Curated annotation (Swiss-Prot):
The keyword Iron does not apply. The lineage of its organism: Archaea, Methanobacteriati, Methanobacteriota, Methanomada group, Methanococci. NCBIfam families: PRK00346.2-1, surE. This is 5'-nucleotidase SurE. It catalyses: a ribonucleoside 5'-phosphate + H2O = a ribonucleoside + phosphate. Its main location: cytoplasm.
Length: 262
C-alpha cells in the first residue's frame, strides 16, 4: 500500500508528524511525506504556473525523511506523484490541519485543495482537520503546542473503514472536535453553508492610507446534519463525502428553464 501525506501548514507541522507516525505504526505501507516549505493556509487548490519549484529532502522532528516543496499543497501532490513517487499512490491523506475545515468555505482550504488534486489524479483521497478555538494557534508554522495524537488515531480509525472497499466519493473530509477522544461518535454529514461570518477590519498606516485584515466569527447555528453542527454543537467527529464534480444538482431544471434561450 502506497500512501502520500501532504498538508498546508508546512512540512514541520506537528499535525503532519502525528498522522505519519500513527499511519506507519498501524499499516504495512510505504508512507511518503511531501509538504510545503512554508505555511500555505487559505491557498485553496492554487498551483504554481509562473515560478519554478524546488524539492528539498529534509528531516522531520522524528528524524524521518520528508520532501519540502517551495510551493502550494497542490504543487506538493503534483510533484509527489510525478517526481517523488513517479506513480499515483493508493491513498493521499492531507493534514492534520491546524483548525477545522467545514462548510462550503472548504474551497479556500489548502488542505482540501491537496485532497481534491489527489482525487483528480485518481488516488483515494482524505482531508483531515482538528478544531482549534485559540485563534493565534491556527496559522502557526512549524511546531505547535496542540496535542494531535488523539486526532491522528481518530483519523486512522476512520481511514480503516474505507480500506478494501469501493471508494464512495472523490474526497472524504474528516473534522475532529478539539475535545475529542477515541470514543467520540462519528457522524456522516453534509457541508454547511458557511463556517465563518466574514469580517473586514480597516486600519490606517503611518501614511494615512487604509489597509485591511480579513477574518471571521465562527458560525454556530447551522442545521443539524451539517458538518458545522456536528463538530461545534454536538461535538462529534464529522465525515463528509465530497466530489470533484461541481455541477449544480438541479441541472435538469436548469436545462428546462434556460435551454431554449440559447
Amino acid at each position: 500500500m502506497e500512501i502520500l501525506l501532504v498538508n498546508d501548514d508546512g512540512i514541520y507541522s506537528n499535525g503532519l508528524l502525528a498522522l505519519k507516525n500513527v499511519i506507519c505504526e498501524e499499516f504495512d505501507a510505504n508512507v511518503t511525506v511531501v509538504a510545503p516549505t512554508n505555511q500555505q493556509s487559505g491557498i485553496g487548490r492554487a498551483i504554481s504556473l509562473f515560478e519554478p519549484l524546488r524539492i528539498t529532502k529534509t528531516k522531520l522532528a522524528d528524524c524521518s525523511e520528508g520532501y519540502a516543496v517551495s510551493g502550494t499543497p497542490t504543487d506538493c501532490v503534483v510533484l509527489g506523484v510525478h517526481q517523488v513517487l513517479k506513480k499515483v499512490p493508493d491513498y493521499i491523506i492531507s493534514g492534520i490541519n491546524i483548525g477545522e475545515n467545514l462548510g462550503t468555505e472548504i474551497t479556500t482550504s489548502g488542505t482540501l485543495g491537496a485532497a481534491f488534486e489527489g482525487a483528480h489524479h485518481g488516488a483515494k483521497s482524505f482531508a483531515c482537520s482538528l478544531q482549534v478555538t485559540t485563534d493565534h494557534l491556527k496559522f502557526k508554522e512549524g511546531e505547535s503546542p496542540i496535542e494531535f495524537m488523539t486526532a491522528a488515531r481518530i483519523v486512522k480509525n476512520v481511514f480503516k473503514k474505507f480500506l478494501d472497499d469501493e471508494f464512495p466519493c472523490d474526497v472524504v473530509n474528516i473534522n475532529v472536535p478539539d475535545n475529542a477522544t477515541e470514543n467520540t461518535p462519528v457522524e456522516i454529514t453534509k457541508l454547511a453553508k458557511r463556517m465563518y461570518s466574514m469580517h473586514v477590519e480597516e486600519r490606517i498606516d503611518p501614511r494615512s492610507r487604509s489597509y485591511y485584515w480579513l477574518d471571521g466569527y465562527p458560525v454556530m447555528d447551522e442545521e443539524d446534519g451539517t458538518d458545522v453542527y456536528a463538530v461545534r454543537n454536538k461535538r462529534n467527529v464529522s465525515v463528509t463525502p465530497l466530489t470533484l464534480d461541481n455541477t449544480a444538482k438541479n441541472i435538469d431544471e436548469f436545462k428546462e428553464k434556460y435551454g431554449k434561450k440559447f
